Amino acid sequence: MTKKELVKFLVANFKDEFGYVDLSGLNFKDEEIEAVDIRGMKVNGDLYQSEQKVKGDLWQQEQEVNGYLYQYKQQVEGSLHQEEQTVKICLYQEKQNVLGNLLQEQQTVRGSLHQYKQQVEGNLYQEDQRVEGDLHQDCQEVNGNLYQGRHKVKGDLCN
């Protein structure tokens, strides 16, 4: 089965009456695999990536979302990579607990970007963010270093 065929299968079998493809609750813990790669997602609607518990690194990169992108309540024992994301409406990155580094770089948001209640044991990298709306960064706890630079914000920068 190709990835294109898999997408067709998932839509045909998991789309509900509201038009949502619900893949929540997938459990790979009992499978003999090294990783699950969810990079490169392209979604015409909204994309929810929440309540994920990862013992290694979590890579959420190269994503194009024409609606809202929600990345919240994520617990990562390694590093969390949220880079090269393009979002048409709003990007929410909230309530993330990361034992390693959190990388939120090269993000382009046509609406607002909300980064709230992020707890990072390592370093937090928030660089090269392009936001046409408002950029909200609040209640971030970082035990390592905080790197913020090259922000281009057309709206308000709310820290």
Language model segments and positions:
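Tandem repeat scaffolds
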Residues: 15-159
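The feature captures the LRR N-terminal capping module
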Residues: 1-21
